Design a protein with these regions (language model features):
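Short, well-structured hydrophobic secondary-structure segments
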Residues: 38-79
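Solvent-exposed alpha-helices and their adjacent loops that cap or buttress functional pockets
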Residues: 29-33, 58-59, 99-101, 127
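N-terminal intrinsically disordered, low-complexity segments enriched in P/E/S/T
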Residues: 2-6, 12-14, 22, 128-134, ...
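A generic structural signal for short beta-strands and their flanking turns/coil linkers
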Residues: 35-37, 61-67, 90-92, 105, ...
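Short, structured patches in soluble enzyme cores that scaffold and shape functional sites
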Residues: 43, 71, 98, 111, ...
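Short, recurring structural edge motifs at helix starts
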Residues: 34-41, 54, 103-109, 123
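Short, solvent-exposed interaction modules
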Residues: 49, 74-123
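A low-complexity, Ser/Thr/Gly/Pro-enriched, surface-exposed linker/loop concept
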Residues: 11-32, 66, 70-97
């Protein structure tokens, strides 16, 4: 089974994309320079808003989750895993982790990339407040 979830967001001048363990997309519209894992703001969805079918499929320990982040022609693909402990309860944030840590904000674990691994070309685009960013989450179980 393959389920796709699309989240639209935008860039922000304070995007750092330097965190080594996670990356985050948030519904918040403000961002300080301390938010070094945040790669997009103004998202249309938080973890709690994701489709029920997506959540159920991602809660399987053998689920494969692919996250594609696109800004115009520049894109990054991240491969991660599902986990039976995912709760998808946070109303504001979507967090992808390299580790196995799970909380209400977590949408995938065991990722092969974090914010610091994104191309600097993409990061430059993510620093533009007018830049539309498309995040596509695909779960296969």
């Amino acid at each position: 089974m393959r389920i796709v979830e699309v989240v639209d967001a935008r860039g922000h001048e304070n995007v750092q994309s330097t965190h080594r363990a996670t990356f985050e997309v948030t519904r918040e519209t403000r961002l300080t320079r301390r938010g070094d894992c945040v790669v997009a703001v103004g998202a249309m969805k938080g973890a709690a808003d994701l489709n029920l079918r997506f959540k159920e499929a991602a809660r399987k320990d053998n689920a494969r989750i692919t996250i594609t982040i696109e800004a115009d022609e520049v894109k990054e693909v991240v491969r991660a895993k599902g986990n039976s402990r995912l709760s998808f309860t946070h109303p504001m944030d979507l967090v992808v982790r390299r580790s196995g840590y799970v909380c209400g904000r977590t949408v995938a674990v065991g990722a092969d990339k974090a914010a610091s691994h994104f191309s600097r070309k993409l990061v430059e685009k993510m620093r533009d407040p007018c830049q539309k960013i498309k995040i596509t989450l695909t779960v296969e179980s």
